[in-house]
Amino acid sequence: MSPQTETKASVGFKAGVKDYKLTYYTPQYQTKDTDILAAFRVTPQPGVPPEEAGAAVAAESSTGTWTTVWTDGLTSLDRYKGRCYHIEPVAGEENQFIAYVAYPLDLFEEGSVTNMFTSIVGNVFGFKALRALRLEDLRIPISYVKTFQGPPHGIQVERDKLNKYGRPLLGCTIKPKLGLSAKNYGRAVYECLRGGLDFTKDDENVNSQPFMRWRDRFLFCAEALFKAQAETGEIKGHYLNATAGTCEEMIKRAVFARELGVPIIMHDYLTGGFTANTSLAHYCRDNGLLLHIHRAMHAVIDRQKNHGMHFRVLAKALRLSGGDHVHSGTVVGKLEGEREITLGFVDLLRDDFVEKDRSRGIYFTQDWVSLPGVLPVASGGIHVWHMPALTEIFGDDSVLQFGGGTLGHPWGNAPGAVANRVALEACVQARNEGRDLAREGNEIIREASKWSPELAAACEVWKAIKFEFPAMD
């Protein structure tokens, strides 16, 4: 390097470490319509001011590093840096703050959830200045939303494909989740679909194991659903899990499902990864397959209240990446889910425009500009006594999925499916007649059980089942 070049590079450059807040804390900043906005729950280490912590998050998730570098002078930091533009304390929590960060859109590759998350929830979560960090919400600007395909088909197209309207859809996860042969698995699928369910489902960890290879499962399940369709006159589906060890193998399984003529396949989007999921969603749209999404591994990311990422962010990411269904919790079953918070991200999955509402955990107004919606799937420890509450909470545009609540029926799989279908039809009819499902739900189920022995037997088996545990965290 020549002396002249050295002199030029060193002009205005001072080596060393600067406080992040001098560059990245900008409370006067006016956010732009094109900015990606993030709300982080920040727990600073003792002695670290909240402004410095918020600025550190903005820096480490955008252009910053631990020291000043001379190459900063070769670009426009003001154009590309993230900015912490507001900080507020969290009510009732000691040393916790919500830090709002704005990111310029040019920081992100178009149509890539993978790239967006690599920046926003990447290395910054291991930053030593923070005791804990949680991403509570994201505002995805319209200009970025329009770079994504989103769900392969969406709610209305799915209803048209299935020719089913005016009620939630019914599903069942085949149990035991592991260990059945393909033929016995297909038998359970047939019995549940014949009994009145719309869908049956592979469990999330059913891929291609020694006891049941994927091709055998696909063949027996396809035979089962076509037989059930012929006998009931209704369109049926089974979520064939295409998740695999490589993207190439995943697409091979999706191709085989399409060749069989089945309507829907499935993917584990967190363990499989967003790149794989987006690729599969594109294939499904191009080839007329619905795509069911399981959220296995979500609690590793979202269960801690002060660290990780709230599921509403994962739900938004899924709507961008692509999926026609996604598991969303039940509010009433065996898995965690607070009612208002759950309904907040259910609206973010289904609705075209969602207003800011902090009481439901929605930190930003979100405009999806007609990106197709995603059906929330309520699944986990639910049975016929939960049907009125589920119908009232989730409404028509949902999938209610009863695994043990179908297959655990004392008379067998088909009667278990009948019991759930009768309970659902009774609840929908009662709601349409103006009855209050929240107040009269148990009575509605009892009335229906008088003319349905299958429902009466189910009511007796599960009358005392509750999943109520004191929260310890």
Swiss-Prot record:
Note: The basic functional RuBisCO is composed of a large chain homodimer in a 'head-to-tail' conformation. In form I RuBisCO this homodimer is arranged in a barrel-like tetramer with the small subunits forming a tetrameric 'cap' on each end of the 'barrel'.
Organism the protein comes from: Cajanus cajan (Pigeon pea)
MF-aspect GO terms: magnesium ion binding; monooxygenase activity; ribulose-bisphosphate carboxylase activity
Reaction it catalyzes: 2 (2R)-3-phosphoglycerate + 2 H(+) = D-ribulose 1,5-bisphosphate + CO2 + H2O; D-ribulose 1,5-bisphosphate + O2 = 2-phosphoglycolate + (2R)-3-phosphoglycerate + 2 H(+)
Record PTM text: The disulfide bond which can form in the large chain dimeric partners within the hexadecamer appears to be associated with oxidative stress and protein turnover.
PANTHER family in the cross-refs: RIBULOSE BISPHOSPHATE CARBOXYLASE (PTHR42704), RIBULOSE BISPHOSPHATE CARBOXYLASE LARGE CHAIN (PTHR42704:SF15)
Taxonomy, superkingdom: Eukaryota
Name listed for the protein in its UniProt record: Ribulose bisphosphate carboxylase large chain
Modification N6-carboxylysine occurs at: K201
Family classification: Belongs to the RuBisCO large chain family. Type I subfamily.
Broad class of where this protein is predominantly found: plastid
Active-site residues (renumbered): K175 (proton acceptor), H294 (proton acceptor)
CDD domains: RuBisCO_large_I (cd08212)
UniProt feature coiled coil, ranges: none
GO terms for cellular component: chloroplast
GO biological process, one term: photorespiration
Pfam family name, one: RuBisCO_large
Site (Transition state stabilizer): K334
Annotated localization: Plastid, Chloroplast
Record flagged with keyword Magnesium: yes
Residues reported in the UniProt entry to bind Mg(2+): K201, D203, E204
Keywords tagged on the record: Acetylation, Calvin cycle, Carbon dioxide fixation, Chloroplast, Disulfide bond, Lyase, Magnesium, Metal-binding, Methylation, Monooxygenase, Oxidoreductase, Photorespiration, Photosynthesis, Plastid
Sites bearing N6,N6,N6-trimethyllysine, chain numbering: K14
Described purpose of this protein according to its UniProt entry: RuBisCO catalyzes two reactions: the carboxylation of D-ribulose 1,5-bisphosphate, the primary event in carbon dioxide fixation, as well as the oxidative fragmentation of the pentose substrate in the photorespiration process. Both reactions occur simultaneously and in competition at the same active site.
Cofactor note: Binds 1 Mg(2+) ion per subunit.
Amino-acid positions noted as binding substrate in the UniProt annotation, renumbered to this chain: N123, T173, K177, R295, H327, S379
Propeptide regions on this chain: 1-2
